C-alpha cells in the first residue's frame, strides 16, 4: 500500500514537472513573438517610404502593420505555443519582405494576368484629343492581339497594341480605324507614340518617325470602361508579353517635332498638356503615383526585373 502511495506521488510530481516545462515553452514562444512585434514596429518607425531609390516602397508600412495587428490578435486570443510559433514565423517573413521591398532600379514585365489599371477612361477626357507615348520591348510575339494600353469595350474605345510582330493603333469611330508599323524585332526597345485629334485623324510613330496615319470620325468611348496598360480590360487573353516603360498620357496632340524630342522620355511632370507620366524605372511595388502627383495606378501580377546591365 505504501509503495502504491509513493508511486502516485511520483506520478503527480512528474505531471507537474511536465506542465511546468510546457508553461516555460509557452512563455518562451510568447516572448519570442513579443520581441518580433517590437522589431517590426521599430522597422516601421525607423524607415522612410518614398519614390526615391533606397527608400521603402510606398504601401509597405501598411502591409507590415497588418501583420503586426494580426500578431497582437494572436497574443490576446490564444495561449497555444504552436499559434505563437506560427505567428512569429509569419511576422518574421513579413519583416524580411518589408526590407526586400526597398525602392531600386527595375523594369516591369507584363504577362498573363498582369495589368496596370489607370481607372475609368471617362476620367481622362480623351474624346477631343490625346497622345500616348511609351517605350516597349517584346520577349514574345503572339498571333493574336497584345495590348500595350487599351480601353476597348465592345464597339467603343481605343487601343495601342501589337498583332504578330507589328504595333497597331486603333480607335472606334463607329468602325475600327487604325494604322500600323512595319515588322519589329524581339528583345529590343522601341519608342512608340500614338495621337488622336477629333476631326483631324490619328497618327502612329516609331522611334520618333511617323509610320502611319489615317483620317477618322469621332472617337466613341464607354466612360466607365477601364483604361489598362499591359492588357485589354474586356479580354484577358489580349495581354502584353514584354516590358513597358516611360508611359505618358497627354491632353493634346504631340506634334512630329515633339514626338521626336520625346524619345529620351525625360519628363519632369510639369510639361504643358501632360496628363500623367510613369517612368516605370524603379520597383515601387504595386501602387505608383505618376510624376505629376495627380494619378495613382495599381499594378497586378507585374514582375519587376533587374534592369539590363
Predicted regions, residues:
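Bacterial Sec-dependent N-terminal signal peptides
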Residues: 2-8, 13-47, 95-107
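Amphipathic, non-membrane alpha-helical rod segments
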Residues: 40-98
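Extracytoplasmic low-complexity segments
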Residues: 99-112, 122, 263-309
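Extracellular glycan-recognition modules
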Residues: 103-168, 201, 253-258, 272
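Extracellular, beta-strand-rich glycan-interacting domains
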Residues: 130-140, 238-264, 275-285
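Short, aromatic/His-centered strand-loop micro-motif at the edge of beta-sheets
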Residues: 169-191, 234
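Short tryptophan-centered beta-strand motifs in secreted/extracellular beta-sheet-rich domains
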Residues: 187-196, 204, 248
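Flexible glycan-contacting loops in extracellular carbohydrate-active proteins
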Residues: 214-243, 269-275
